[in-house]
Each structure stands twice: as structure tokens, then as C-alpha cells.
């Protein structure tokens, strides 16, 4: 592939010049874009020869001014990888009227069917010239498997921006990508979220860890160096997304049979634990004052993973003050079940007025995602290394189980590392198996 040039589009069997769009160039500055020899201006990055990450493609204005063109993306994939050899994995959970539909994909694919001769001619030229992307990792040792042929162009498996997916979904997606790619060395998986950073990065890193045996640190580095220009970003950085990658790291150290066992037991576990106690360790003087209130929300995804459901709200003015200065809340006995994957959010407000609280809430905001089942396993395995230690019935203990997360390990505003005003030194969460 050559250096970036002017953008071209297929028309009347060949190519037509059109001006380069400045907005696309500005918005994709941090990305290390793969150049192509047919003049298409696309924000795409090859992580492997058969694994692409890109930003969100669109087919309507005004977003066509600064996003990937869906037409251009499909044309690129058809020319460089061949008709029927690619599948798009869409990780966006948020919905907008301008989102591309399945019918849009089908229509674009059909349009290029009518230009098949010209596309195949162009593809043959590129192959003969050796202008096919090269992967930094050798894939020759991959074992191919047979699969029934299907014409699915896109799989929509999304969740909300800046968050990790439910852990079971993370494993399902990674395995789904491998199942698709393992059918043929000609196939390519195209991953996108909004910017091709956090959600796509998580899945890419998890895939490299599981199927190319890369350590977590190395997998993060491969993604960062392949997707971004030097010094622009560290790639996947949101603490909860990294926590779920560490869960994944823990999970894949088990043999395949144990992995299946853990997945099966996780379904049972969500009805077998009770959130018992929450403690703010060394709270700041700010939240121990009479006027300031910290609102804690305990949430999980809805079924479509495009919104959060709030299961419990706790206000700091009803928390107990312990001798050491810590603040605690003990959950009622009726509060028994949560999803394994839950989110805890902390916002600062005031008891003086709603308007003031709304303004103050922007001065401090922090949150975290946890998978309670995996947190339990990572605690239990220190004392119980039996082959079936992960079974729910073996997890019961007389004492509470728990985890402590420092303020710095919480998520901040969106993808930013900043949390605003520090509310406490650390969060301690405790639960019991019932």
C-alpha cells in the first residue's frame, strides 16, 4: 500500500476523483491509518492481516463529512479481501437515527456486485503487485475448521461507550471472531465501536491474549502501536476495561473444560450472592461535612445493553461513621440478587438545593465495574486449588468475601483519567454467598 493520496470512488466501472475532506483528516489525527492504493480516505488499522479496527462507518450527511464512508469501507474490503471474505463486528450499544442498517449493507454489497468485473480486475492487480497488508504476527500455524457458509455481513453485539461488556459477552465475542476467522485464511474481521479505541481495543486485546497467546501487556502494546500514532494515546486505558481484561487473563489460564465449567457456574451464581456492606475508607473532609452528600448508585445493564438499570441508591448522610473515620452502609437482608456484572457510581452533591447539586456533580464523578463471581473466584483460588473450586456450592464461606479498590483505580469522566475532587481513599465492597 502506498502513501495517502486523493480519494476515489467507483463509478461507471472505474474510478472518479473527488476532493480530500479536511474534517476527516483532523478528526482521525491520533489514528495510524492504513494507506491504500485506490485513493479511499478511511480510518482503518490492521492489527493482524485478518483483524482490522476502524472508526464508525456512516452513509448519511452530515456525519459523512468526518466519519468513514460505509460505501468506501465495503469497497475497500471487497477489493482487498474479496467478496464474502469479511464480516463487520459492531460494538456500539448506543442508538442513533443516522446508524447504518442491515439493509444499507445489503444494498451496498449488491451495488458492487454489478461492478464485479472491474473490482476483480483491480483486486488482481493489487495481488500481483504484492500490495496486500502484512500482519506483524505469523498466522500460518492456525488450524482451519469447517463451517456452514452464511452471508452475514455484520454482527451487532454492542454495549455502552467507556464501559466493559458483561464478562460472558466478552468471551462470546472473542470466540465468535475466532470461529469466523478459523474457517479460511482469506477471511478478515472488521471491528468498530465509535472511534475504534476502547471497546474495539478491549476485544482486540482479549483476542490476542486468547488465540495468539499474547500476555496482557504485550497485547495492549500491539493494539496501541498498530492503531495509534506514537505518543498520542496508550490505547485501552479505562480502569474497568483493564479490570475485565485481567478477569479474561485469569479465565484463560484455565483448561478448556474448566473454562466451560466457570461459564456454566456463573449463570447460577447471580442468584446465590448478596451484596452486604459498602465502606468508604478514609473519606475526605468534604463528604463528612453536613452540607455535602455523595450519591452512590448500584447499576447493571438492561437486556439490550444500551442503558443502565439502577438497583439501589445510597446517600452518604445515612451511612454510619466508624471509630476509624470510615463510612459504612449495610445492605438490608431483602437485597439479595444482582447481575454478576455491576457498576457502582459515586457523584458529589449538596443537601442545600437540587440546582446546586446539579452543578456540584460535575466537580467529582467516579465509578467502577465489577464481576462479583470472578472477584469471588480470584479470592477463593488462593485457598482452594481443587479442580472444581469454581462450583457455586464450594464457594460458601463463613466470612464475608470482598474487594478493595483505590480512588485512582476508579473510572473518571468518560474516557478521561480525572475524577475531579477526591471523595475517599478507597472503596471496600463485601458480599456473602447464600
Curated annotation (Swiss-Prot):
UniProt enzyme class: hydrolase
Keywords assigned by UniProt, alphabetized: Hydrolase
GO molecular function: phosphatidylinositol-3,4,5-trisphosphate 3-phosphatase activity; protein tyrosine phosphatase activity
EC number annotated for this UniProt entry: 3.1.3.67
InterPro entries: Dual-sp_phosphatase_cat-dom, Dual-spec_lipid-protein_phosph, Prot-tyrosine_phosphatase-like, Tensin_phosphatase, Tyr_Pase_AS, Tyr_Pase_dom
Pfam family, one: DSPc
Protein's UniProt keywords contain Repressor: no
Entry-linked PROSITE patterns: PPASE_TENSIN
Name of the featured protein: Probable phosphatidylinositol 3,4,5-trisphosphate 3-phosphatase TEP1
Annotated gene: TEP1
